[in-house]
């Protein structure tokens, strides 16, 4: 008989893994200038380390969730972390830029399925009344990664070489792997095979399809600018060390924004999204103007404002999809959530690639304003859906 493991210890192991995952996703943002110099490539090419990673998560979340439905959850978690370590080691020792991208994509595939599996494990190890809190504890690893992991990884890369940043993350994942081996129970429920008909049910449901589009454009617009935040700040005259400190404060602003956004989205997520997207657009426009003016003080303020509003919409976007899934496809809530994770990362891909194109054809200075245009598309989708709902309610 397996010795009972404290749920808090299991959640601690998941939080360590989430910290490593969160650090890896955005570590390239701080390392872009170093990667450009190391491989003698353009800034937009270096941006592929962000956009292709997001594409890997997009594929990994739904596809691997479907393929591994019958696997033991603990064994799957250990396999995910081994894949994640492999991807970071390949990136760390990459002799060419192509090999670096291969390492990033492998890590991204692990990231995609981790988000689905870890949420289920967190919910399974606690009583039903504590499930939301358990998932929140696990996700604190991602928040802490934004505040400390990315800046620390960037600092390590600046003081040594960018390769060491990926070794740093691989070492954290190794700790998470060991913790998972001892602290994740062996006898967790196995969800079973995913009903592929659920895909049809989800993508023939108009509100859900529009919710994915809102997620992709509303979340993704930020990344046209955020992907290139380090060179933007350096263009404003900030040193490499100053950029690290700014990224730490940026992460704190993200954490505050997430908390505020969660409170705003509790009652009417759709209405709150219009407000949060509008604030995000204003912050992107402000950043564009300050960079154009070459004003370092206002540019710093605009960057921190972007941190506050950039990810404020995440709780609302997640809640809106869950509410729609509960209403229209209650048997496919897990799959709908996986597709929303994919939508988040499609947004990152679209945003970061747009930033790359803008950087190549105009200048990195113009990335924030194009990000604002992408978010504006999400606002139009929200207004359309809200109008549809009002008309439907009037007929009832």
Predicted feature residues:
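Paired small-residue
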Residues: 83-90, 95-107, 297-305
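Cytoplasmic helix-loop-helix junction between adjacent transmembrane helices
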Residues: 97, 103-141
């Amino acid at each position: 008989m397996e010795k009972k493991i404290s749920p808090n210890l299991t959640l601690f192991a998941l939080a360590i893994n989430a910290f490593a995952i969160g650090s890896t996703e955005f570590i390239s943002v701080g390392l872009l200038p170093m990667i450009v110099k190391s491989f003698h490539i353009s800034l937009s090419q270096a941006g592929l380390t962000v956009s292709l990673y997001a594409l890997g998560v997009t594929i990994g979340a739904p596809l691997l969730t479907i393929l591994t439905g019958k696997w033991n959850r603990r064994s799957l978690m250990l396999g995910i972390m081994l894949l994640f370590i492999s991807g970071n080691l390949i990136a760390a020792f990459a002799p060419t830029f192509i090999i670096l991208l291969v390492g990033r994509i492998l890590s991204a595939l692990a990231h995609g399925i981790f988000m689905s599996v870890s949420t289920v494990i967190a919910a399974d190890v606690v009583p039903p009344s504590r499930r939301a809190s358990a998932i929140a504890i696990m996700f604190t690893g991602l928040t802490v990664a934004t505040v400390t992991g990315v800046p620390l990884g960037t600092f390590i890369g600046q003081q040594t070489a960018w390769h060491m940043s990926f070794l740093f993350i691989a070492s954290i994942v190794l700790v998470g792997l060991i913790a998972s081996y001892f602290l994740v129970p062996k006898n967790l429920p196995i969800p079973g095979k995913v009903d592929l008909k659920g895909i049809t049910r989800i993508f023939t449901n108009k509100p859900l399809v529009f919710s994915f589009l809102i997620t992709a454009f509303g979340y993704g617009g930020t990344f046209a600018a955020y992907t290139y935040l380090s060179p933007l700040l350096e263009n404003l005259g900030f040193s490499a060390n100053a950029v690290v400190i700014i990224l730490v404060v940026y992460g704190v602003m993200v954490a505050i924004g997430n908390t505020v956004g969660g409170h705003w989205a509790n009652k009417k997520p759709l209405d709150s999204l219009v407000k949060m997207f509008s604030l995000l657009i204003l912050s992107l426009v402000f950043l564009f103007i300050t960079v154009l003016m070459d004003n370092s003080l206002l540019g710093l303020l605009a960057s921190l404002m972007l941190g506050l509003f950039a990810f404020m919409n995440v709780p609302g976007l997640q809640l809106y999809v869950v509410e729609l899934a509960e209403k229209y496809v209650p048997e496919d809530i897990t799959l709908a959530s996986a597709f929303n994770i994919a939508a988040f990362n499609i947004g990152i891909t679209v945003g970061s690639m747009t930033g790359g194109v803008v950087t190549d054809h105009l200048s990195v200075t113009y990335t924030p304003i194009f990000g604002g245009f992408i978010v504006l598309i999400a606002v139009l989708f929200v207004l359309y859906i809200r109008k549809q709902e009002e008309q439907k309610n009037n007929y009832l």
